[in-house]
Amino acid sequence: MGAAIIWIAIRHSNFPFTVRIARFILDSCGHGGVDMFLFLSSFGLYYAYRKESDYVSFMKRRLIRVLPYSMPMCLILFLFGKRTVSEFLIDFFGLSIFLRNNWTYWYTSFILFMYFLTPLYLKVFNKNPGRSTLCGIALVSVICYLLPSYQYVYIYFRIVIFLLGFYFAYLNEYHRDFKCWPLIPVMCFGWYLMYYYYHHFGNDIPHILPFVFIIPGLVILLAWIIDKVRIIQKPLDFIGIYTYQFYLIHEDLFAKLLERWSDWYRPGIHFDFFINLQGIVMAFIAAIIYKKIIDYIIELLKNRTKRA
């Protein structure tokens, strides 16, 4: 999770990459961090559901990880004039992926939607994992083909990544002898496909399809690297604790910071690097503080409920 959120942060910042391949992977393809996040989320949800298959209990645990953080932030942004009334209501109730909005908080809406579907899907999935995955991918592909707006396709096709996370969690549990090396050439093909889009459509890549090939192999490769280089494991684990809060905060904070500093200086390469790095650090500190405040309030409410 830590690596995924760093990738997303770089994508949403404005780092002045001078090396083309670095700009391509870290900036132009940075939206892949979301797909990595979704893949890892469904991977973890598979095991969470195995431990607790009761629908109500499962949903309660999932919602408590999202709503206490997303709802106050939506209210804060609305009060500071960053959202209209309609945008606030859509974001607050997690309806962004169903109703056209500014898409800033589409991930919250998407993950809530997937939480609701997960227990239902896994009941079918457990009967025949391979067939369920293929049928799910086919169904999502048909639905995306019929959608009227490409913006919706960009969101809903990510369900495929989510389904792959379930399948690889199943392989990890029941087929530990599964050979991972074939995923490397598949990942390379995905990068080639992505570079093709990059070459023909420019720096802004609106395509999600190549990450279906990239993400499984990339996650396994990064897991292997992190396991070998233990010095980076703890920092990434620590960052991973605050990924959702960082997601809620970082875009608006980046925009405000860059707007303020651009009034004082004309951006240059060293200055741009400093400002963007400062933005990421500030957003991360703000995410830690925000999470601790909300967690403290939740704990107070729990204690009062017990006393009552």
Please give the residue ranges for each predicted region.
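Transmembrane alpha-helical segments and their boundary/interface "anchor" motifs
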Residues: 4, 27-38, 47-100, 114, ...
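Small-polar-interrupted transmembrane alpha-helices in polytopic inner-membrane proteins
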Residues: 4-11, 132-145, 185-190
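Alpha-helical transmembrane segments of multi-pass membrane proteins
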Residues: 6-17, 82
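Hydrophobic membrane-targeting alpha-helices
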Residues: 12, 41-48, 75-79, 116, ...
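Membrane-interface helix termini and inter-helical loops of multi-pass transporters
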Residues: 17-24, 86-95, 199-203, 260-268
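Hydrophobic alpha-helical segments with transmembrane-like composition
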Residues: 36-38, 44-47, 66, 70, ...
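Alpha-helical transmembrane segments and terminal signal-anchor/GPI-anchor hydrophobic tails
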Residues: 146-148, 155-163, 170-247, 251-279
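Membrane-proximal cytoplasmic C-terminal regulatory module of class A 7TM GPCRs
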Residues: 294-308
